[in-house]
Amino acid sequence: MKETHRKYPYPRRRLIRSACQLLAHAAFAALADLRIIGQENLPSGGPLMVVANHFSFVDPAAMVRAVPWPIEFIGGFQMPNAPPAVTWIPKVWGYYPVHRGTFSTDALRAAEAVLEQDGVLGIFPEAGNWATVLRPGRPGAAFLAVRTGVQILPLGFAHLNDIFPKLREGKRARVTIRIGKPFGPFHAKGRGRARRPELEAIGHEIMGHIAELIPPEKRGHYSDDPAIRAAAEGTEIYPWDENPEA
């Protein structure tokens, strides 16, 4: 067994994650009117990278609800947009933290090890939920796609931000999860700086697949409507470029 597989085993926390999956099913049934579209697109298993838009702190739970596997996440070390009452949930599930604004070598090694073990990796390419329209992805998802050569499964989440406002009105929000067809693998010929344009193009292709699965008015930088693209200007600014997570 490779040393990285010992350090980053897949699957892990099986009992805890099975319980959390049941909790996610129950929570969405109680709190929202949920539709999942495209379940016929689910492959038989890994290695697989699952990607989705990231507009809400509820998104990781929605990904757990949408797919049948014990998904492994890499995600932000801090959770600035999540209510303090729910920040314990990702810690119980367990994930490999990324210190945003840094290269986060350890998290990338963990992600590679998970995929080498035919695992399923969840990642939100936008690397944060500070906006409610689609933004260009950060380099991490494209880098892992090229590095591992695995297929990618796109998900599109709609109206998750409505869940708690609707509950305060005594109503259940109508939430949709769309599952797209797997795509990839990707390869890049260049090395170092010469590879950057290829990775950027792959990143845009990944986001384009996600854009097809969300409402047109939420497609932001990937909209066909110039007015929507113009309104999204500025959302691509990454808050951690100047202030990396410690």
Task: For each feature predicted by the language model, list its residue ranges.
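Non-catalytic C-terminal accessory region of glycerolipid acyltransferases
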Residues: 1-16, 106-246
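A transmembrane-helix-recognition feature enriched in membrane-embedded lipid enzymes
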Residues: 2-41, 83-93
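Short, basic, glycine/proline-bearing loop/turn elements
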Residues: 23-24, 92-98, 124-129
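Glycine-rich, highly charged phosphate/nucleotide-binding loops
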Residues: 33-35, 102-108
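Conserved beta-strand scaffold positions in the cores of enzyme catalytic domains, especially
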Residues: 36, 73, 95-97, 152-154, ...
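Flexible, charged surface loops at secondary-structure boundaries
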Residues: 42-45, 116
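Catalytic core of membrane glycerolipid acyltransferases/transacylases, capturing the structured
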Residues: 44-102, 110
